[in-house]
Amino acid sequence: MAHVSRRTLLSSVVGFRSGLAVTRPKRIRFGGPIFSKSNDPGELAREHRRLGYSAAYCPPVEINDRERIRAIEQAFARENVVIAEVGAWRNLLDPDPEKRRANLAYVTERLALADEVGARCAVDIAGSFNPDVWYGPHPKNFSREFFDATVDNCRRIIDAVKPRRAKFAIEMMGWAIPSGPDEYLQLIRAVDRKAFAVHIDVCNGINSPKRFYENAAFIRECFAKLGRWVVSCHAKDLEWVVEMNVHFREVVPGRGQIDYGAYLQELARLPVDAPLMMEHLKTPEEYAEGARYIRSVAQRLGIDFY
């Protein structure tokens, strides 16, 4: 055995402790839709990077187009742009049994696609019993029937695909389960699948004046209770339109009251680089405005981007 002097040993220990004391820069992944007309995976990936994005929505591709799936995965990996999510926006609780079966099959296929392309998740809402608006309110959306049916749907989707990489996630909605972190925890425990994960959409969960005004506390509560399961997040903002009843309206990040300082700090603390994805804006200019605002808040907090 080689001799190690006391001085060398002490130097190593000091160096190790010093290394522990160094704080790694906080970084998050950030993205949004792009408006490129190209269908080429390489060009699409580079356009995300040109816009300063390190995360993307999955480009259009069919589950049976294996060549394009591989091309997308490889092109985006080369640019260090992760595919944050595959949207699976269908009503899993449609009152029409035929539509419900078709929607379940569609969402199952979207999870399979997410797994094949290397996306972080496939995401949907739990659905609604509303017969007219697929995501609309209904008195039974907080019922035991709704909860049990959602658990069954999530299990069916995950068990059919058996994903190796992607997760299946349900978004919060203000008028359906889960509408907050506690209902989300109940859902996680009931589904009882490792492939079931959390998709944070802060604005979707703000369904009262109290949550609107105390949204920083709501954000921190969501991450404190759900952080270990978070795989992706949505970015937008809310303003209160003054009427004779409560009316919140989605706006460009920075124009509303969402506490992005709290949001970005909680994201940066996660053990994984869960992407933050802007959505629901109308034009490239609005997305650019929202991105500038989010980056300015991050810069003030010392948070960087991949």
Task: Place the predicted regions along the sequence by residue.
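N-terminal secretory signal peptides and thylakoid transit peptides that target proteins
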Residues: 1-17
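C-terminal segment of N-terminal export signals and the immediately downstream linker at the start
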Residues: 20-39, 47
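Acidic/histidine-rich catalytic cores of soluble enzymes
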Residues: 86, 155-257, 299, 305-306
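Acidic-and-aromatic substrate-binding clefts and catalytic sites of carbohydrate-active enzymes
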Residues: 34-42, 58-69, 91-95, 130-132, ...
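Acidic (Asp/Glu)-rich catalytic clusters
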Residues: 23-25, 43-50, 65-85, 111-118, ...
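Active-site acidic/histidine proton-transfer and metal-coordination neighborhood
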Residues: 13, 19-22, 78, 97-198
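Hydrophobic faces of well-ordered beta-strands that scaffold small-molecule active sites
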Residues: 28-33, 56-58, 83-88, 122-124, ...
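Conserved, mostly hydrophobic/aromatic
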Residues: 48, 56, 76, 103, ...
